[in-house]
Amino acid sequence: MKDFVLDASVSLGWLIDDPPSPYAGRVQQLMINGARPLVPIHWHLEVSNALLTAQRRKLLRRDLPEILANINALMPFIETDDLPDDIGTLVGLGQRHQLTAYDAAYTALAARRNVPLATEDAAMISAARSLKISILR
């Protein structure tokens, strides 16, 4: 089983988008085949906020209870890393690579665990490459 860090935007790609992006679909298939996603502690808040925002803006193409059921079905397979990196590390990554603190947390987790990063975010991909972190394809 291969571990990887899962960016919230990728998971939202298969939870909200109908159909999901090709990349989100490939990542979901890797999970079905046994790859284990790792997420930073704020992932749950980021996903929850995105769902609330999408619902308020009437952007959800599926019912929220169906989306929540899909998330709950995934939760046993997602490992939450509850050891946040220190603030200096996150701020430093953010400054050097033009990342938000949230995106720096995903990047730092991938670096610390020495696992690939699943993201389509251009700034995160650029930061990961400069840090020799592989991008899940």
What are these regions (language model features)?
Residues 1-3, 80, 107-137:
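Acidic, PIN/NYN-like endoribonuclease modules and their adjacent C-terminal/linker elements
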Residues 1-42, 54-66, 131:
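Short, well-structured N-terminal submotif of metal-dependent ribonuclease cores
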Residues 10, 43, 85, 106, ...:
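Alpha-helix capping/helix-boundary segments
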Residues 23, 46, 89, 126-127:
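Phosphate- and divalent-cation-binding pockets in alpha/beta enzyme and binding domains
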Residues 30-32, 73, 85, 92-96, ...:
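Long, hydrophilic "mature protein body" segments
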Residues 42-45, 102:
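Aromatic- and histidine-enriched alpha-helix N-cap/loop-to-helix transition segments
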Residues 48-78, 89:
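Active-site-proximal, substrate-binding regions of enzyme catalytic domains
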Residues 76-116, 120:
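Active-site neighborhoods of divalent-metal-dependent phosphate/nucleic-acid chemistry enzymes
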